From Swiss-Prot:
Source organism phylogeny: Bacteria, Pseudomonadati, Pseudomonadota, Alphaproteobacteria, Hyphomicrobiales
Top-level taxonomic group: Bacteria
Record's protein name: Protein-methionine-sulfoxide reductase heme-binding subunit MsrQ
Subunit record text: Heterodimer of a catalytic subunit (MsrP) and a heme-binding subunit (MsrQ).
Species of origin: Agrobacterium fabrum (strain C58 / ATCC 33970) (Agrobacterium tumefaciens (strain C58))
Transmembrane segments: 17-37, 50-70, 85-105, 121-141, 152-172, 177-197
Gene, per the UniProt record: msrQ
Length: 215
């Protein structure tokens, strides 16, 4: 059942500019942290801190992208035009997070990378999330939607698997359950739970619309 809340939507002629503005604003935190890392503003271990912050922002944008559908279904807040941008920004942060790990943290030394993975297996979860995200990012365009048809929706449901491995990667990397991991675990549970009950909610909404209005 949807709540009686509706926000005015932006006229379509302004949407492209709004989407590009979202890309610029969304990538600003990464650029800011890069500047801080390069100028000594991230403290004692700037590489680790930079790597961690990129991962956090990847998780934030991933969650924001997955919130678009519940907001539309339950509150009539239609941000569907921005979902692709939110997903791609999340992908860019995951890619940057992984690149910083490989290049700055491990220095592209294969032995060091392999040893680190054996010592910290949760790194494999992060790598799995990136691998799954690659085809999702590559098919986040109208041509792929037309080409793949119904298979596109099936493919992009894998984003929920990315959410699971991303949250697990984050929680295991923290090595302790504090407020921040609890927040992302809770967000994951809510998003996955809504995905499970959504068919029932949408059926109820369709039945309500089909019901004759009493005069």
């Amino acid at each position: 059942m949807a709540f009686a809340l509706s926000l005015p939507s932006l006229p379509k002629r302004y949407q492209p500019a709004a989407i590009w503005s979202l890309y610029v604003i969304g990538l600003c935190p990464g650029l800011w942290y890069f500047y801080l890392a390069a100028t000594g503003g991230l403290g004692f271990n700037p590489v680790k801190d930079f790597e961690h912050l990129l991962g956090i922002w990847a998780l934030r944008f991933l969650c924001l992208g997955l919130l678009v559908t519940p907001l539309r279904d339950l509150f009539n807040v239609n941000l569907i035009a921005y979902r692709r941008a939110l997903g791609l920004i999340a992908f860019y942060y995951v890619l940057a997070h992984f690149t910083v790990y490989l290049v700055l943290d491990r220095g592209l030394i294969l032995g060091s990378i392999a040893g680190d993975i054996l010592k910290r297996p949760y790194i494999m979860l992060g790598m799995a999330g990136l691998i799954i995200l690659i085809p999702l990012a590559l098919t986040s365009n109208r041509w792929s939607i037309r080409r793949l048809g119904s298979r596109w929706n099936t493919l992009h449901k894998l984003v929920y698997l990315v959410l699971i491995v991303g949250v697990l990667h984050f929680v295991l990397a923290r090595k302790s359950i504090t407020l921040e991991p609890v927040f992302y675990i809770s967000t994951m549970v809510v998003l996955l739970g809504y995905r499970l009950v959504r068919p029932s909610i949408m059926t109820m909404k369709r039945n309500k619309r089909a019901r004759p209005v009493r005069t």
